[in-house]
């Protein structure tokens, strides 16, 4: 598969066309941003870690019946994916109170919800990715009712699978963000699953092992990312 021209560059990834119309190459960057781009920096080897972690998790989910855009890992920083049209939605699943929901609802960090909380955000940098509900999604024609139902069903299933998986690695999956796209195959899980898009806490120490270390200037950011990679690579 030959890499062609750059199609899109985001905060954490570059997307390239290939010599096959239905496939793209994603290259993961070391650039880090937080608070909708207000804080910027570099996390050494982040791109390598996120590419490898995402590849392992996509393969794991595929084996358990979750269709994804992932095809294979090409290089340390690159993966081959199926071309999809991305829904302009962030699908957030929260198992514990952390981050913005604590400020928004006056919750103490670390409270475990009786059941997972699902939130939608409208992917729009100019608006700051505002939270929306299913009525907004249909009104803005971002997805149909059937598509929303399928996305929710898949998101909860991913949460069920990954929560159990990470617990086996002594990691609590606190919350995470998913994105979905569609092509001729149907709706596929897309984007990435990594310490950039998930909150991971060590089960025994409650130490943060994710991008919150960058957001909150906690230090040892690279070490936390590498620790997640080390654990997911364990058989």
Swiss-Prot record:
This is Phosphoribosylaminoimidazole-succinocarboxamide synthase. It comes from the Bacteria. Its EC number is 6.3.2.6. GO terms for biological process: 'de novo' IMP biosynthetic process; cobalamin biosynthetic process. Keywords: ATP-binding, Ligase, Nucleotide-binding, Purine biosynthesis. Pathway: Purine metabolism; IMP biosynthesis via de novo pathway; 5-amino-1-(5-phospho-D-ribosyl)imidazole-4-carboxamide from 5-amino-1-(5-phospho-D-ribosyl)imidazole-4-carboxylate: step 1/2. The gene is purC. One of its GO terms (molecular function) is phosphoribosylaminoimidazolesuccinocarboxamide synthase activity. It catalyses: 5-amino-1-(5-phospho-D-ribosyl)imidazole-4-carboxylate + L-aspartate + ATP = (2S)-2-[5-amino-1-(5-phospho-beta-D-ribosyl)imidazole-4-carboxamido]succinate + ADP + phosphate + 2 H(+). PROSITE patterns: SAICAR_SYNTHETASE_1, SAICAR_SYNTHETASE_2. Belongs to the SAICAR synthetase family. NCBIfam families: purC (TIGR00081).
């Amino acid at each position: 598969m030959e890499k062609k021209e750059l199609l899109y560059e985001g905060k954490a990834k570059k997307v390239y066309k290939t010599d096959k119309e239905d496939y793209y190459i994603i290259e993961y960057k070391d650039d880090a941003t937080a608070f909708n781009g207000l804080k910027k920096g570099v996390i050494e080897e982040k791109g390598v870690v996120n590419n490898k972690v995402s590849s392992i998790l996509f393969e794991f989910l595929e084996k358990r019946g979750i269709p994804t855009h992932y095809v294979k890992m090409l290089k340390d920083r690159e993966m081959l994916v199926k071309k999809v049209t991305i829904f302009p939605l962030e699908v957030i699943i929260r198992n514990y109170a952390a981050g913005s929901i604590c400020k928004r609802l006056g919750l103490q960090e670390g409270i475990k919800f009786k059941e997972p909380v699902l939130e939608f955000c409208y992917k729009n940098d100019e608006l700051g990715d505002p939270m929306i509900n299913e009525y907004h999604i249909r009104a803005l024609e971002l997805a149909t009712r059937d598509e929303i139902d399928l996305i929710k069903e898949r998101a909860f299933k991913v949460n069920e699978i990954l929560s159990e998986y990470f617990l086996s690695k002594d990691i609590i999956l606190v919350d995470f963000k998913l994105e979905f796209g569609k092509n001729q195959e149907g709706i596929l899980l897309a984007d990435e699953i990594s310490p950039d898009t998930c909150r991971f806490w060590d089960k025994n120490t409650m130490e943060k092992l994710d991008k919150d270390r960058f957001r909150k200037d906690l230090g040892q950011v690279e070490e936390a990312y590498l620790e997640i990679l080390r654990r997911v690579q364990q058989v």
